[in-house]
Structures are given as structure tokens and as C-alpha cells.
């Protein structure tokens, strides 16, 4: 089988057509899907209701199932988490989320992630859209003067976990410009959500640089804006792109199931500590 797809935007995104992720697929098709993900960074599978195991199988074309990061994985059978304001214990329930790559505030940025739409706001203009930015293309087209200024710089990436009875700050120092471990392409790691300061510089010096990078990656030519439909699944390369969420009416219910994968050397099991919450 040769995959058919429809491009979603100029720089990134492809809807996979004539393929049902609920069906069994062989190594040849798995390899095609991996190549499509490498080429387009974000893959859309539209209108196919997936159970957890089916979503896990699809996401694992990009890596090994991991329990690193969001959620308290105490059940060995738990393979996903919920981004939801409709379920007790749901993560990041509502409100706007600025551009970021998941777990960029830890030693290893998460390799890939999928989201599957379970519950959505009842009217189309309610918000809650997911935006993706091609931070590799954005790096390629960065102004030479700005590129030279930020190439050698390292920054503090930081996030706060709220565990209900306590909060915990997790942070890591990494370069503003990274190299994709699989493809070798350079990408802009700086994100509005979690990049807090540049090491060795005063705020008056680094804020203009960070603002310039943020504004650059958020330009329309680098963005794919996804308007969710029930049973949509998005799978993305979490290093090649950053993502964000538009705000939505908190009275509206929204729930997406998330599955995360890593390289085998990075992935952790439910019995291992997660570096993001340790």
C-alpha cells in the first residue's frame, strides 16, 4: 500500500488518506508512516475513533511508549493521559497555552506525541484549536544577524507542576538553537511558554532576543492551525515543531487523549521515576 495524503499548510502537516489506523499494518506501511512524519512533522488521521491500544500502536511508529512527564503513572496498564476539563485529574484543562515543545525543560525533549479528540466544545467558534509551528523551517529562514547572535546562547527552560497539594518547579539549561537527533536539522528551541532567561546575560539584553525568536516562529507562514473534529488524531514530531492552544470557553467541555513516545534509551516505565516530576 502506498500512502495518499493531503498537505495541510505550506511548511508542515499532512492528512493521511485511505488509511484506517484501527486496522493492522505491517512494517512496510510503518516505514511509510515514519517517512511521512519526518517529511511533514504533523500527521492527521481524521474521523477514526480509536481506543487507547489503537492510539498507542499508531503513536509507536515514532518511538517507544514512555511514561515520562505529565501525569502520575501508578498503574502499569495506564498508557495515556487526558488533556481535559471534563475529567477529574485531567491536565491543562482550559485556557490558552503558548508555544512550546513538551518536556523541553528536561534533559531530553519528548520525541513524539499524539492527541485523539474525545470531547469537543459544542460550537465551532468556541476555541480550543491546536497550532503547530515548524521551528526547523523558521531556523532556516532566520535573519543572519539574529542567527549569529543566538547560536552560542544557552537558556533556562522552566515549568511548574501542580500536584494539588504542592507545586514543583522543573528546569533545565539547554541551547536556544538545537539539533534534531534523528535528522541533524537545526531548530529554534526557544519557546514563549517555558524559556525564562538566557544564561550570562542581563534581562535587558536577552529579552529582545527572545521576543524576536518568539515572534519569528509565530509568523503565519510557519503555522498549521488545527480545528478539531471528534475522532481526529494528530501525531507530531515534538522536536521539529512547537505547539500551542487557543483559549476556549471554560463552560465548554474538551477532552483529548495523549500518548507519548521516546527513543528506547530515554523512555521510562511506570515503575521508574519520571525525570520531569522527580
PLM regions and their residue ranges:
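Non-heme Fe(II) oxygenase catalytic core, chiefly the N-lobe of the double-stranded beta-helix
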Residues: 2-233, 239-278
Amino acid at each position: 500500500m502506498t500512502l495518499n495524503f493531503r498537505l495541510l499548510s505550506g511548511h508542515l502537516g499532512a492528512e493521511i488518506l485511505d488509511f484506517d489506523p484501527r486496522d493492522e499494518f505491517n512494517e512496510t506501511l510503518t516505514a511509510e508512516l515514519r517517512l511521512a512524519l519526518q517529511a511533514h512533522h504533523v500527521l492527521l488521521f481524521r474521523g477514526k475513533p480509536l481506543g487507547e491500544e489503537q492510539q498507542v500502536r499508531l503513536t509507536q511508529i515514532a518511538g517507544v511508549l514512555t511514561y515520562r512527564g505529565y501525569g502520575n503513572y501508578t498503574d502499569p496498564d495506564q498508557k495515556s493521559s487526558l488533556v481535559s476539563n471534563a475529567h477529574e485529574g485531567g491536565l491543562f484543562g482550559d485556557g490558552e497555552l503558548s508555544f512550546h515543545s513538551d518536556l523541553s525543560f528536561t534533559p531530553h525533549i519528548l520525541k513524539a506525541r499524539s492527541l485523539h479528540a474525545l470531547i469537543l466544545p459544542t460550537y465551532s467558534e468556541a476555541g480550543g484549536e491546536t497550532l503547530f509551528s515548524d521551528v526547523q523551517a523558521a531556523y532556516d529562514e532566520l535573519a543572519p544577524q539574529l542567527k549569529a547572535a543566538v547560536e552560542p546562547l544557552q537558556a533556562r527552560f522552566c515549568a511548574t507542576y501542580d500536584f494539588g497539594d504542592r507545586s514543583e518547579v522543573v528546569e533545565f539549561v539547554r541551547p536556544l538553537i538545537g539539533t534534531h537527533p534523528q535528522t541533524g536539522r537545526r531548530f529554534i528551541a526557544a519557546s514563549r511558554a517555558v524559556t525564562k532567561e538566557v544564561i550570562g546575560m542581563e534581562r535587558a539584553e536577552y529579552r529582545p532576543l527572545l521576543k524576536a525568536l518568539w515572534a519569528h516562529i509565530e509568523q503565519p507562514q510557519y503555522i498549521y492551525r488545527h480545528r478539531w473534529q471528534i475522532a481526529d488524531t494528530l501525531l507530531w514530531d515534538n522536536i521539529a515543531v512547537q505547539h500551542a492552544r487557543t483559549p476556549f470557553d471554560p463552560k465548554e467541555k474538551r477532552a483529548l487523549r495523549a500518548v507519548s513516545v521516546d527513543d528506547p534509551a530515554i523512555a521510562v516505565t511506570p515503575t521508574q521515576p519520571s525525570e520531569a516530576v522527580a
